[in-house]
A protein has these predicted regions:
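Extended alpha-helical surfaces
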Residues: 1-242
Length: 242
């Protein structure tokens, strides 16, 4: 299903653009499984600076490339991340599936919570206005107006309650590993709840999501090893792909 494949397209766009900026080949970093062939995207960008991709992905790639030329790799990542999640949300809305729309909201909430905690730990709250994503259960404005130590209260009514409490502690120097694990577990819990539905779309879509996540993990591990990445970098990519 395309919704579960979008993230591969944006991963590959990031790899292609950053490799070009560094003057190296992205081969070994590209992942299969996206809506568009990764090798074709690489060749098109290298030869003509264009991509066979969705309109949203092409627009985001052009903006990201411009930011990389201005030596703003963080800005490039943020533009592509925002476009990726926006495409996922739009596609979920088109399906009219409450399960899929809730799944994407869960992913956006987890991404925003991670962003808020990392910004607090690094003392870089100025990045929040352009880093936080629209479309979650908690608004970017609400997150920006909340002190890091009170993130648990802001997300307390949802699936990220435990993660938010650990995030509040991590923002002040607590364990980042426990916080990241809790974010992953919250998404797993959302899928697990759907598995208990005996019939209906949830059962099928939950199965697809679980299989896609397993395939994603295998691809990232194998690609990372082939590229000589450290175990820590591979673990980071696994978290970001969830």
């Amino acid at each position: 299903m395309d919704l579960f494949r979008i993230k591969f397209d944006y991963h590959n766009i990031k790899a292609i653009l950053k490799a070009e900026r560094r003057g190296i080949s992205p081969e070994g970093l590209l992942l299969s499984g996206g809506r568009y062939d990764a090798e074709r995207m690489q060749n098109e960008w290298h030869q003509e600076h264009r991509l066979t991709a969705s309109d949203a992905a092409r627009d985001a790639a052009e903006k990201a490339a411009a930011l990389l030329r201005e030596n703003d790799p963080q800005g490039a990542d943020l533009v592509l991340d925002a476009a990726c999640y926006a495409e996922m949300a739009a596609l979920a809305a088109e399906t009219k599936s409450g399960f899929l729309q809730g799944y994407v909201r869960q992913l956006i909430d987890a991404a925003n919570l991670r962003t808020a905690v990392r910004a607090a730990r690094s003392g870089s709250s100025e990045v929040l206005p352009r880093a936080l994503l629209e479309g979650g259960s908690v608004s970017p404005h609400g997150i920006m107006m909340t002190e890091p130590g009170k993130l648990g209260e802001l997300f307390g009514a949802g699936a990220l309650e435990k993660a938010a409490a650990l995030g509040a502690a991590a923002a002040g120097g607590g364990s980042l590993t426990a916080f990241e694990k809790a974010c992953d577990e919250a998404t797993d819990a959302y899928l697990a709840a759907a598995r208990r539905t005996p019939f209906g779309e949830e059962t099928v879509l939950c199965y697809l999501a679980a299989v896609e996540n397993e395939i994603t993990a295998i691809r990232i591990i194998m690609t990372g090893r082939q590229a000589g990445l450290s175990p820590e970098m591979i673990r980071s990519r696994l978290r970001n792909a969830g």
